[in-house]
């Protein structure tokens, strides 16, 4: 067997300088949500994503990877809850108890734009392409933050503590806490 070491990586922790990554894949996302104050249920209405793909090899595949990574992250932050018994047994260990996002959670308005950068300064990547499968997972933070902003709208000017994943129960609890103590700031996780 062999190994691969990405060339040119370095990091000096004493100085906080170096090149710890070969390149960066940047992106931005904006999410619009709707929250029911009585149940904590929410709907993702719209997502707009811009993701840096370098020089896209196959645009349709890149878009699918970006959408898939985003939806996976959305599940992690909104419904994929791990629950444990007092004895340490995982209680959410089956499809009936561990919820993942379905097509019903994906918004109809799901827009993905590709930012293309033909030449990557200093990087010798395959045909100029960049990673598009894993980085979009973090773009789903826009969903959780949109949910937090929606909950905060119930008590304007108040910071909101919202658990992750932001399940309907967590959203309902956050709204109930705002109603119980109006005007008091909650710690933001």
What are the language-model segments listed below?
Residues 1-189:
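C-terminal catalytic domains of large/alpha subunits in multi-subunit enzymes
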